[in-house]
Amino acid sequence: IGFDSIRRGGGGANQVSALQLPQLISQENAVVVDVCEAEEFNRGHILNAINIPLKQLQDQLGQLEKFRTKDKPIVLSCRSGQRANRAAAILRKNEFKKVFTLSGGLTAWEKENLPVERKS
């Protein structure tokens, strides 16, 4: 992607900011994968995010295979960004190429007043 300010983050993934993510979604059909536990995910997540808790990620890689074959960017998020970095390392180890993490996680997203979906 052509964003000058994307930086290398933990887990060997590039980081995108909360303000860059909507652009990555609209221009490259990026998929957001939230690696929080289900209860935390239900309290708030990025619109249309897929929930695969970090503990289950290795066993659920098949769910993401269709995005790898379509060469879609995968953006990993969690509350602060720490679990997303660990998830990025798992995806990179399994040869996913377009792996990004949301810098600052959902906390940074909310700080920018971007929309959050909640499930009751």
Predicted region positions:
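Rhodanese-like catalytic fold shared by cysteine-dependent sulfurtransferases
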Residues: 1-30, 38-73, 82-120
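Conserved beta/loop motifs at nucleotide-recognition and modification sites
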Residues: 33
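Short cysteine clusters
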Residues: 78
